[in-house]
Design a protein with these regions (language model features):
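Activation-segment/catalytic-loop signature of the eukaryotic protein kinase fold
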Residues: 55
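Structural helix C-cap motif within protein kinase domains
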Residues: 182-186
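AlphaC helix of the eukaryotic protein kinase fold
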Residues: 21-43
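Conserved short submotifs of the Hanks-type protein kinase catalytic core
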Residues: 59-73, 77
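Protein kinase catalytic-loop region centered on the HRD/HxD motif
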Residues: 96-108
Length: 250
């Protein structure tokens, strides 16, 4: 949300500067979401969440400054590799899963967990981009029935515009694991309306069919996050990733 520039802080360290464009700065709802992103990110102090270093307004344009993570995104890693092995997937996502749980512990739901919002520095990974984050204690900036998020990673309740919860982010994390292992989200490669319908109605694909090196127990553990009902998904993101690792090493 906005344009991101690379900059240099007063002390000489590289930073990422996210600026709302002139056009979007006239959109009151967008600006309020941007301000909410700042407030949400500033609430979280976690080693796997990209911190906000500064925020303000310049020339009428709101901005925020974050630590620059130099290794690109998980999306770029998947695009380059095609697929990741299970060990790499779990290693990369274990930290962000803890960061996601930290968000939830602060009353936040990210609502846009996807590979592009997981940044890498070697094998260390970070959650970023809180532009759609929902504070359970704050007023809602969306209309009833309005869905916000990225289509390939949206939980059924999110598509329906219903209340979101920690389980919504866990669903998205399950979609991310699918993409890491197969190169595509579970219902990817279809027209938009078919993707929506699949999230709402279809059982997720069995990863072991596309990846014979992933055993049936692990495939089942991965798909627990993609249950249609939020209460049927794992209780936390970190516990979910650990359950996948446990199934793989049993």
């Amino acid at each position: 949300m906005g344009i991101v520039f690379e900059g240099v802080a007063d002390g000489g360290s590289p930073v990422a500067v996210k600026v709302v464009t002139t056009e979007l700065s006239q959109d009151e709802v967008f600006v309020r979401r941007f301000q909410r992103e700042v407030a949400a990110a500033q609430k979280i102090q976690h080693p796997h969440v990209v911190p906000v270093l500064d925020a303000g307004e310049s020339g009428g344009l709101p901005y925020l400054v974050q630590e620059l993570i130099p290794g690109g995104s998980l999306h770029e890693r998947i695009e380059s590799a095609g697929q990741l092995d299970l060990a790499t997937t779990v290693r990369l996502l274990a930290g962000p899963a803890e960061g996601i749980d930290a968000l939830h512990g602060s009353g936040l739901v990210h609502r846009d967990i996807k590979p592009a919002n997981i940044l890498l520095d070697g094998d260390r990974a970070y959650v970023t981009d809180f532009g759609l984050a929902k504070d359970s204690q704050a007023s809602n900036l969306t209309r009833p029935g309005q869905a916000l998020g990225s289509l390939d990673y949206m939980a059924p309740e999110q598509i329906r515009g219903e209340d979101v919860s920690a389980a919504t982010d866990i669903y998205a994390l399950g979609c991310v694991i699918h993409e890491c292992l197969t190169g595509t989200p579970p219902f990817g490669g279809r027209p938009s309306m078919r993707v929506l319908f699949a999230h709402l109605q279809e059982a997720p694909p069995d990863i072991s069919e596309a990846r014979p090196d992933v055993n049936a127990a692990t495939a089942k553990a991965i798909n627990r996050a993609l249950e249609k009902e939020p209460e049927d998904r794992p209780a936390s993101a970190a516990a979910y990733v650990k359950s996948v690792l446990k199934a793989a090493t049993a």
